[in-house]
Swiss-Prot record:
Annotated organism of origin: Thermoproteus tenax
Cellular component terms per the entry's GO annotation: membrane
GO molecular function annotation: transmembrane transporter activity
Pfam family name, one: MFS_1
Superkingdom of origin organism: Archaea
Miscellaneous comment text of the record: No homology was detected between this sequence and those flanking other archaebacterial rRNA operons.
PANTHER family for this protein: MFS DOMAIN-CONTAINING PROTEIN, MONOCARBOXYLATE TRANSPORTER
Name of the protein in its database record: Uncharacterized 38 kDa protein in 23S RNA operon
CDD domains the record matches: MFS_OFA_like
Family annotation (InterPro entries): MFS, MFS_dom, MFS_trans_sf, Oxa_For_antiport_fam_transptr, Proton-linked_MCT
Length: 373
């Protein structure tokens, strides 16, 4: 069996490609809108589809990966992810484009769960740092791709190229990963019956709103050269702080790290109200991007690593709620009240997430593990 560092590296590479569905949208959406004559709300549909489908696919794919191992599930998911980009490039209209994007999003979601939980299962002793390093790829991949997409200027050429590269890289790589044996944990059924799971769920759904609002709608708030700069910088920022905040979670505990990330994310959103767009994007990118790994770290500590791909996949579905709030709802508030109202909405969501966590007692206490069979 390869050394566990190999699995960490494989998870990182998979994450680099996973980020392309989320963090290229600020550049692809205006191109698609111009080519197909779509408005702001119609452009937001693609991002909403991605968030909902990718998150809903995770629990089912995660359960299969926990049961049968990640190889076959990962390879099939890699094919779907690649075909999503290729289908988007070839689609003659928005309906088929949305269909292709949805199928690809399902593959991306399952791959995300496998990549993240390679770190969870192999690095219980350095959980925060390891998951942070793997998740660094979720920003870095798009930071490399976005300038290339902007230089091409044609969404069909860009998405076709991405899809072909994914077929060549992700499919063989997915066949080379595996999970360790002999882990303990709490089954998804027991996790769902624990009130703390739903506390984490509601809090994450709200806490993700600032990050996902900028991921889907940054082009509504800034324009021109600043948009290209920030759209390229944003995913890099999203990944950059994940190892640092993950290491802090190992030292302080994940709950304290979550509070810090939510507070700075809310402050960054409010900074944009004062016209400090670059400061705000940096603050939200650095801390908002780390929020998901901190919630999944806390979930893994409570419920254990054995069923982590499924349990974390269930928790990750809260991103579908957050994505709907951060794309469709954010766009609706923007249409009604402009940038100021929509940014206030995003900041209030992060503050509400903190309040939900504070109301739950004994949040960090591990749940007794299922008996080994």
């Amino acid at each position: 069996m390869p050394p566990r560092a190999w699995y960490l590296a494989a998870g990182f590479v998979i994450m680099c490609f996973n980020s392309l569905y989320q963090y290229t949208w600020n550049l692809l959406a205006p191109m698609i809108g111009r080519a197909m004559g779509l408005g702001v709300l119609a452009e937001a549909v693609g991002f909403t589809i991605y968030v909902i489908v990718s998150t809903v696919a995770q629990p089912a794919g995660g359960a299969l990966a926990d049961l049968r191992g990640p190889r076959g599930v990962g390879a099939l998911s890699a094919v779907l992810s690649a075909l999503g980009f290729i289908g988007a490039a070839l689609a003659p209209g928005p309906a088929l484009l949305y269909l292709a994007w949805g199928l690809g999003s399902a593959g991306e979601g399952v791959l995300y769960g496998i990549a993240f939980n390679l770190a969870v299962k192999w690095y219980q002793d350095k959980l925060g740092l390891a998951t942070g390093l793997v998740s660094l790829g979720f920003g870095l991949g798009s930071a490399v791709a976005n300038p290339l997409i902007a230089s091409v200027g044609n969404y069909r050429e860009a998405t076709l190229a991405i899809g072909v590269v994914e077929l060549l890289v992700l499919v063989p790589l997915s066949l080379l990963v595996d999970y360790p044996r002999g882990l303990s944990g709490v089954s998804p059924r027991r996790a769902l019956l624990d009130a703390r799971f739903w506390t984490l769920y509601a809090s994450y759904a709200l806490g993700a709103v600032p990050l996902l609002s900028l991921a889907s709608s940054l082009h509504l708030l800034v324009g021109g050269g600043e948009l290209v700069l920030l759209a390229s910088l944003y995913p890099l920022l999203v990944g950059a702080a994940r190892p640092l905040l993950g290491a802090l979670a190992d030292k302080w505990g994940p709950l304290k790290a979550i509070y810090l990330a939510l507070a700075v994310s809310a402050a960054g959103t409010l900074a944009m109200l004062a016209g400090l767009d670059i400061v705000g994007v940096i603050a939200v990118g650095l801390t908002g991007g780390a929020i998901i790994i901190l919630y999944l770290n806390l979930s893994s500590r409570i419920f254990g690593p054995k069923y982590a791909t499924a349990n974390n996949g269930l928790l990750y579905t809260a991103k579908a709620v957050g994505g709907t709030l951060g794309s469709a709802a954010f766009g609706y508030v923007y249409a009604l009240g402009g940038a100021r109202a929509s940014l206030l909405f995003a900041a209030a969501s992060a503050l509400a997430a903190m309040a939900i966590l504070a109301a739950q007692r004994g949040l960090e206490r591990p749940l007794p593990r299922d008996p080994q069979l």
